[in-house]
Amino acid sequence: MISKLISKLGYTRFIALSFIPVILLGTFLLCLPISSKTGEWTNFTDSLFTSVSATCVTGLIVFDTFTHWTVFGQIVILIMIQIGGLGLMTIITMISIFLRKKINMRERKMMMQSSGNTQIDGTLKLVKKIVGGTFIFEGIGAVLLAFRFCPQMGMLKGIYYSCFHAISAFCNAGFDLMGFRQPYSSLTYYTNDYYVNIIIMSLIVIGGIGFIVWNDILKNKFHFSKYLLHTKIVLVTTAILLVAGGLGFFIFEYNGELADKTVPQKIVNAMFMSVTTRTAGFNTIDLSNLSDSGTLLSLILMLIGGSPGSTAGGLKTTTIAVVVIAVFAMAKGGDDINTFKRRIVSDVVKQSAVIILIYLFAVMLSSMIICSVEGLGMSQVLFETASAAGTVGVSKGITNQISAISKIILMIMMYGGRIGGLSLVLVFGQRKPEAPVKRPTEQILIG
């Protein structure tokens, strides 16, 4: 059955569309009275928005997760986060392996593309490592968080909250249950808690660097020279973005949102902002009061997002890195684009440029429409749309105030951000075979 669907739809289209059944089932379950603390039906649009946000591991919400949803509803959201983080095809493959069902070549190729692997050999082993590694990291995170949550909340509630937030952080989802302290407060209660901050940050970063990078590090340990070019670019770019982002927030918010904190607290909160604005959606400070510089820095980091083959969305670290490397290569007057003693093929540069243009166009267009419909300021709306496109989930507090039309636009942005801009074009576009005769070239003026 699956093999026939793959053959008919193609790998990219099948992987992208595999999120839709999860979203629809989640929407139905969240609509039910059993999911709502009021015991009433939740309207379809808000249930769909929550389902899309959870499955696309974003974290934008129209209701406070603790205040509105029952434990049943919260678990439905958590399952969608886990499926969205791993990918439905990874889950299906693991079930097939567990049931000892034969996985044919077409399904293996599909899994290769879904997991981000470059070779079909070893794809099933990689899938096992992905699932095993995910549960190990989430388990370690839950145990560590339990040491803080259990004394504060009691044993059962502490364990439940530890598991929920560990999974949400590792999958870069940003959903939280801290509304019992104050609705929509996220992790602001723990703003000066170094222990919780470091654990959440670590889970977000590990989940956001990608499964291929894990596998490469596991295989080659800490021998950087032996890593794949992909791994080298991801690690270096991630490190630069974390440090630069943290430094930026430290400077821009020193006398702003971080003014009442000690220097060590400022550093930790600035680093947390640098981590979470790229992929996760948690916040330890009030984002509605960010300075203009801090808001602009957040927009940039949100659009960049995490790394390919990870639980994160956005443009991806490698996309930005390739374009930056290409710019420097062009400035030097060279024809080849080289880095780490390897040459990057021109097709990758073209695809990277296309992806950036797609994201920028989508964010600008959707922001203009929402501004027109809602009458809100551009800064707030840009923040929201960039958060949706990067599947980040941080907000300046307008998500629950906007109309159904604007929610639909944000849902499209979240879905596109999760599967990738180029994949979205390939899903709904019709690829035509190349013409047998190439047209003559002609120069045009640019720049």
What spans do the regions from the language model cover?
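Membrane-proximal intracellular helices of multi-pass ion channels
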Residues: 1-447
